[in-house]
Amino acid sequence: MLRWLTAGESHGPALVAVLEGLPAGVEITTSVLGDALARRRMGYGRGARMTFERDEVEFLGGIRHGVTMGGPVAIRIANTEWPKWREVMAADPVPPEQLADLARAAPLTRPRPGHADLVGMQKYHLTDIRPILERASARETAARVALGTVAAAFLRQAAGIEVLSHVVAIGPVCAPAEPLPTPADRERIDADPVRCLDPQASAAMVAEIDAAKKDGDTLGGVVEVLGYGLPPGLGSHVHWDRRLDARLAAALMSIQAIKGVEVGDGFATARRRGSAAHDEIEAGADGVRRRTNRSGGTEGGMSTGEVLRVRAAMKPISTVPRALDTIDVTTGEPAKAINQRSDVCAVPAAGVVAEAMVELVLADALLEKFGGDHVVETRRNLQAYLDTLVVR
């Protein structure tokens, strides 16, 4: 079983992430993590923080000479802005007079619509939004991307599985559904300003972001994550919490601002008749196969061996420059929401985070099925399974 946790706040000294259950023998380095974290910062429409925030990452445990040792993998991602926030976010008590002249220390009392602010204050009996927004911030996703990068290395080295994402919609602009990108398109996708494979759609998306920025507004969109090389049989039909599609949906819905998930053709299948909704089976040169992949690579809660295809819908960023109406919780009077530094559109980055979450779920499912204390053992068990499939 693979388990992972993250800790840390947006303006704290660092984010910390722990991945437990990974086999020994997986090759991974801090430079690979750094490259992955840089991908998370890319995308047209990002805010000022992305231009000066850089991620200084290090392994704290579980790795020796670029190879996992079988113990928990611990990762630390430093916050280069920490000196500015040292007093405001200090773990130990700070004398009030030391905070009095710091604008950053002023209580935040105007909750932002669409954020965790208001309900977080209610739940945790707070009169200041700061403790809520610090942890609810999407800055936490840097830790998820780091963990997902380690999981991706395991998937690639143990099973040849590759996961990639691309943007299929920003605001009202949608990219063509076909062709699907492959791992060979990864660099081309990342080189695009909005991580969209279709040049015409990309240009229209950029224009839409420019228009939203001019209007003091924000945009959401849809990302698609694809998994190549999955064997049949990851997940299970026997219990709700072992179904692969359910685990993927939960993981994607856990990402900040994600409000919808679909697997394969998803909601479109609800508008079709059954004869046009399912994937018919035939014998191919390489064994049993499906003529189509409307299911998105899962049936009955298990991977089918076809390409995994999941989509996640991201709502527009809740911190709107043209501040939305709210109240000041100290007075109960109408007010404008606080306007923290933010992005116009973070959909391209959301795809990178979605990749990481899918990689973590697939790594967990692969270990659940094939086990292994060393990556060589996992690889051997997988090959033995494939060699002895009753129906192929």
Swiss-Prot record:
UniProt KW NADP keyword: yes
Reactions catalysed according to its record: 5-O-(1-carboxyvinyl)-3-phosphoshikimate = chorismate + phosphate
Annotated positions binding FMN: R135, A136, S137, Q256, A257, G300, K315, P316, I317, S318, T319, R341
Any one GO cellular component localisation term in the record: cytosol
Cofactor binding, per record: Reduced FMN (FMNH(2)).
Name of one Pfam family that matches: Chorismate_synt
Binding site for NADP(+): R40, R46
Entry EC no(s): 4.2.3.5
GO biological process, one term: aromatic amino acid family biosynthetic process
Pathways per UniProt: Metabolic intermediate biosynthesis; chorismate biosynthesis; chorismate from D-erythrose 4-phosphate and phosphoenolpyruvate: step 7/7
Keywords: Amino-acid biosynthesis, Aromatic amino acid biosynthesis, FAD, Flavoprotein, FMN, Lyase, NADP
Required cofactor names: FMNH2
Molecular functions per Gene Ontology: chorismate synthase activity; FMN binding
Family from the record: Belongs to the chorismate synthase family.
Function noted in UniProt: This reaction introduces a second double bond into the aromatic ring system.
SUBUNIT field: Homotetramer.
Protein name (record): Chorismate synthase
Organism name: Acidothermus cellulolyticus (strain ATCC 43068 / DSM 8971 / 11B)
Taxonomic classification: Bacteria, Bacillati, Actinomycetota, Actinomycetes, Acidothermales
